[in-house]
Swiss-Prot record:
The lineage of its organism: Eukaryota, Metazoa, Chordata, Craniata, Vertebrata. This is Cytochrome c oxidase subunit 8C, mitochondrial. Its main location: mitochondrion. Component of the cytochrome c oxidase (complex IV, CIV), a multisubunit enzyme composed of 14 subunits. The complex is composed of a catalytic core of 3 subunits MT-CO1, MT-CO2 and MT-CO3, encoded in the mitochondrial DNA, and 11 supernumerary subunits COX4I, COX5A, COX5B, COX6A, COX6B, COX6C, COX7A, COX7B, COX7C, COX8 and NDUFA4, which are encoded in the nuclear genome. The keyword Transmembrane helix applies. Component of the cytochrome c oxidase, the last enzyme in the mitochondrial electron transport chain which drives oxidative phosphorylation. The respiratory chain contains 3 multisubunit complexes succinate dehydrogenase (complex II, CII), ubiquinol-cytochrome c oxidoreductase (cytochrome b-c1 complex, complex III, CIII) and cytochrome c oxidase (complex IV, CIV), that cooperate to transfer electrons derived from NADH and succinate to molecular oxygen, creating an electrochemical gradient over the inner membrane that drives transmembrane transport and the ATP synthase. Residues 64-71 are mitochondrial intermembrane. It is found in: Mitochondrion inner membrane. It comes from Eulemur fulvus fulvus. GO terms for biological process: mitochondrial electron transport, cytochrome c to oxygen. Residues 29-39 are mitochondrial matrix.
Amino acid sequence: MAHLPRVCPFIRRLRVALLCLRPGHRFAHSEPQRQRPASALEMAVGIVVIFSAFLTPSAYVLSNLSQFRRE
């Protein structure tokens, strides 16, 4: 991070992003590509899980907002 002030003007001029110190290393996939597409049921379950994970805590906070304001 000490070299960042010297490198930043150089990066802006060339429009290059410095992502890591060791170039050439890339992420390898941990498992092979899926052979069949996801079914409608699998997608529906995934969407329900994602939305409930975000909406349940926010619904709790909004329903008890008056208690949070008092504290």
